[in-house]
Amino acid sequence: MSLDPAIASRLKRNEAGLFSAVAQERSTGDVLMVAWMDDEALARTLDTRKGTYYSRSRQQYWVKGETSGHTQYVHEVRLDCDGDTVLLVVDQEGAACHTGTHTCFDSDVLLAAD
């Protein structure tokens, strides 16, 4: 599977060929997680509508929920203005974080809202 050249030409990748992907819950607007993608992971996501990412530590692709059952159905994918990050607008089934919480950003508040 290959990424459409028109999309690939707009992406800015790091030295490892990766770019960041932010998953946002469609119904709440919550930022769920940040992961890495490469062209293949993005192509798979666009083709299947399943959040597919690249693990730097395992050096392999993974589909969110493939083992946990906590799946992401991808409704939209947007490219940011710099071309180095994609936003996935998803329906999250179950926890998004590997710790079992709904979002990876709910436990360590460094500055709370007034």
Swiss-Prot record:
The gene is hisI. Its EC number is 3.5.4.19. The lineage of its organism: Bacteria, Bacillati, Actinomycetota, Actinomycetes, Mycobacteriales. Catalyzes the hydrolysis of the adenine ring of phosphoribosyl-AMP. Zn(2+) binds at residues 81, 97, 104. It holds the Pfam family PRA-CH. Its cofactor is Mg(2+); Zn(2+). This is Phosphoribosyl-AMP cyclohydrolase. Gene3D superfamilies: Phosphoribosyl-AMP cyclohydrolase (3.10.20.810). Homodimer. The keyword Transmembrane helix does not apply. Binds 1 Mg(2+) ion per subunit.
